[in-house]
């Protein structure tokens, strides 16, 4: 990409700005420019699109997004050491890169969007990847402020996001993710593509928000999934007791045999049980 955008190779950028990756920040820098370009392309056409990127580091993916045609990139970076490298990219793409020095866990990018929708594209820091995703999935109101997420995770986490019922990786994260989004595993990235090399393979996942997910109280859905998968080897008639209602009633509302286990229940079944739980609680409140 240095031949395309005229910027120096990433290894030179890292050395010049003393950007040794820090484990405490969950940093693993992706230096393969073919892969950063592939991630950018996975987000679809970027012309006239604002992209929110988390943890850009030395800016490999940032450069790919801009070179691919993103009208504007909002790069949220906590590590002040990376700001100089990002400012060089901003100078190369005048008016198209906005750098925000902030912790993504505490920062709301929506005021910067001015009512526009965006796409989220990021090689997420491993140590905050799942909490960030859950926060985005819990956005209210829905549909959210983003049209798409293309995100990199440790492969084990990626599998938990895209899993379906009867998959070993199916659990609470899959229920929440697939209730609100269409999820797809796109491709894997070997440890050798990163500096430093992580011990595990990474995977890129695309999540496209559903315009109209099945109506459901999100808090109730999270509670039902937590109870069911908290004792995933037990039957629903046992695992759902912690909710303080009759598990058989929840299962019946979903047309599910209460002797089944959580891992066999589709997202629609969890939605039905959550709605029944919410109805029961609302009835108790009114009496």
Swiss-Prot record:
Domain of life: Bacteria
Molecular function as annotated in GO: 16S rRNA (adenine(1518)-N(6)/adenine(1519)-N(6))-dimethyltransferase activity; RNA binding
Enzyme class label: transferase
Keyword set, alphabetical order: Cytoplasm, Methyltransferase, RNA-binding, rRNA processing, S-adenosyl-L-methionine, Transferase
Keyword Methyltransferase part of the UniProt annotation: yes
Subcellular location field: Cytoplasm
UniProt keyword annotation of RNA-binding present: yes
Residues the entry annotates as binding S-adenosyl-L-methionine: 28, 30, 55, 77, 103, 123
EC number: 2.1.1.182
Substrates-to-products reaction catalysed: adenosine(1518)/adenosine(1519) in 16S rRNA + 4 S-adenosyl-L-methionine = N(6)-dimethyladenosine(1518)/N(6)-dimethyladenosine(1519) in 16S rRNA + 4 S-adenosyl-L-homocysteine + 4 H(+)
Cellular compartments per GO CC: cytosol
Function: Specifically dimethylates two adjacent adenosines (A1518 and A1519) in the loop of a conserved hairpin near the 3'-end of 16S rRNA in the 30S particle. May play a critical role in biogenesis of 30S subunits.
Homology family: Belongs to the class I-like SAM-binding methyltransferase superfamily. rRNA adenine N(6)-methyltransferase family. RsmA subfamily.
The protein's name: Ribosomal RNA small subunit methyltransferase A
Source organism per UniProt: Rhodopseudomonas palustris (strain BisB5)
């Amino acid at each position: 990409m240095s031949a395309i955008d005229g910027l120096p190779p990433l290894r030179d950028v890292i050395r010049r700005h003393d950007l040794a990756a820090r484990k405490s920040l969950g940093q693993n820098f992706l230096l393969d420019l073919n892969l950063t370009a592939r991630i950018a392309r996975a987000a679809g056409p970027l012309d006239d699109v604002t992209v929110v990127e988390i943890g850009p580091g030395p800016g490999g993916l940032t450069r790919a997004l801009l070179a691919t045609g993103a009208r504007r990139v909002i790069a949220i970076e906590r590590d002040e050491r990376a700001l100089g490298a990002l400012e060089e990219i901003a100078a190369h793409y005048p008016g198209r890169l906005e750098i925000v020095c902030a912790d993504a866990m505490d920062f709301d990018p929506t005021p910067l969007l001015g009512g526009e929708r965006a796409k989220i594209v990021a090689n997420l820091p491993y140590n905050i990847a799942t909490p960030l995703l859950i926060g985005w999935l819990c956005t209210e109101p829905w549909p959210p402020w983003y049209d798409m997420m293309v995100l990199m995770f440790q492969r084990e986490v990626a599998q938990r996001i895209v899993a379906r019922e009867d998959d070993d990786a199916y659990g609470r994260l899959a229920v929440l993710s697939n209730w609100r989004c269409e999820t797809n595993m796109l491709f894997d990235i070997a440890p050798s593509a990163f500096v430093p090399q992580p011990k595990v393979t990474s995977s890129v996942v695309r999540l496209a928000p559903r315009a109209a997910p099945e109506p459901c109280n999100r808090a109730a859905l999270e509670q039902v999934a937590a109870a069911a998968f908290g004792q995933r080897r037990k039957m629903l008639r046992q695992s759902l007791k912690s909710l303080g209602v009759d598990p058989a009633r929840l299962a019946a509302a979903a047309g599910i045999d209460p002797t089944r286990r959580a891992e066999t229940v589709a997202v629609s079944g969890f939605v039905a049980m959550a709605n029944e739980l919410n109805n029961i609680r609302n009835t108790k409140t009114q009496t």
